[in-house]
Design a protein with these regions (language model features):
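Structural preference for solvent-exposed beta-strand-turn elements
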Residues: 1-173
Length: 173
């Protein structure tokens, strides 16, 4: 999907024809500038999409979530030897929501008292997932439903659904 989007983005404004070959799971894109053939895979070869069984949910305004990501993501670590620090720690409780990021040189905490949860929960969301989420958040104000369990986080807004695997580590105290 990423290669398809990049190919279409780089084409000039002109008519484009798509030819889908279902037997080989390939797509051919034809335009005045040339022909591009992309191969695909059978959907049954991919793992099943996880479901949010035994999970919890919280609604976060898109502008609040975007601000929280912008204020914390730059301080995450690139050190893969310390995976807990390569994401943003999110802590929800009855009184507030806190986003924390550190690379061991900088420590950023962003707290909101207007977003709460009935029970205390905490998780580490990977930097890459938050970067993607920030890029897809709508510019107009909308509510983002975040559902989560012990291993995954599910973000749902407008017609966008995003699932990410949480980092299964203990965040430094």
């Amino acid at each position: 999907a990423k290669i398809l989007l990049e190919t279409l983005r780089n084409l000039p404004e002109q008519p484009v024809n798509f030819t889908i070959e279902e037997s080989s799971y390939s797509i051919e894109i034809s335009s005045d500038n040339g022909r591009y053939k992309l191969s695909g895979e059978n959907a049954t070869d991919f793992p099943r999409v996880p479901s949010v069984s035994d999970g919890y949910s919280v609604n976060i305004p898109s502008e609040v979530l975007g601000t929280a990501i912008s204020n914390t993501i730059y301080a995450t670590s690139n050190d893969e030897l310390r995976p807990s620090m390569t994401g943003v720690f999110l802590k929800l409780d009855e009184t507030n929501t806190t986003f924390v990021a550190t690379d061991s040189h900088r420590l950023i905490r962003y707290r909101r008292v207007d977003i709460t949860s009935d029970m205390a929960h905490s998780m580490i969301i990977p930097r890459k997932a938050l970067t993607l989420l920030k890029a897809t958040l709508p510019t107009e104000a909308t509510s983002v439903t975040m559902e989560f369990n012990t291993s995954n986080a599910f973000f749902d807004f407008n017609k966008v659904k995003m699932i990410c695997r949480l980092i299964d580590e203990r965040y430094p105290d």
